[in-house]
Amino acid sequence: MKRTLLCLLSASLLMASCLPSLVTAPTVVPLNVTQVVPATQTSTQPNAPTPTPVPNVLVPNFQHIVIVIFENKEFGSVIGSPKMPYFNILASSYTLLTEHYATTHPSLPNYISLIGGDTFDIKSDCEDCYVNATSLPDLIEQSGRTWKTYQENMPEACHLGSTLRYVQKHNPFIYFDPIRLNAERCAQSIVPLTQLNVDIASKSLPNFIFITPDICHSAHDCGLDQADAWLKIMMNTLVVAFGATNEPYLIILTWDEGQGDHSCCGLPKSAGGRVATVLISPQVKTGFQDDTPYSHYSILKTIAEAWGLPYLGHAADAETTLIIAPWK
């Protein structure tokens, strides 16, 4: 058995060496699908503050909720693609939302809508179109929980502007005045992806985690195969970290927008297209496909429901569907 684990570990480290700009995963056994839900373990030191549990019968009260977001691919370009075998293994092994629709085009207003409940009339990938409004992080902090966004290849915490592989338009948090204009808050919560391993090692992972790959690993500028290889390493890192504490978690894999303009759920008739969204958790149904129509606002609404937070913007709309069917 030890020889088998060492062989698997060597394979994982070899993959990591081929992707030098990725966050370096801790020394762990490489993830296969059966490891995504770790065996029951005990812990005496939680990763994040444990708020008072919120009684809820609709959505589980997860200790950690993670969003990992990729770029610009329609559902049919991802599901069934031989270039994304790992993503498709996860999609077939856990819960796949088959009718999830992005908010609009281009990228930025989709990101903004995921945490703000609105596009705030942003119609471009502007870098100076800041918003003075309440966002999901405000509500998370008010509930006694913590949050961070980990941005791959961001030069330093709270960085303004874009670089070669980090682009500001894929970081919605920096656009909200209450975050950006509070220097201490911004520096603590908008951080490079390299900070993830530091937080894992110190057992200080926040309750809400938003991970943006760089412009290559998100499949924006590079191929789906590179995004898939990056995802495999990232999933290994996250799941082993959560498994070490046995804290309930939900990982949401999604895409900012598709390549079409399909719509649902009260969105404009011409919206952001159909995207592939996968829910991964010990508390989701396995091998399940949910054909309920959802939008990005549904993700925001579901996070709010899980943690007893107020609904922001269009998350409160009756047409915005709450994600219920996938939970065990």
Per-segment meaning from a language model:
Residues M1-T4:
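Positively charged n-region of N-terminal signal peptides that target proteins for export
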Residues L19-K328:
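N-terminal pro-sequences and low-complexity stem/linker regions of secreted or lumenal proteins
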Residues M15-S17:
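C-terminal motif of bacterial Sec signal peptides marking the signal peptidase cleavage site
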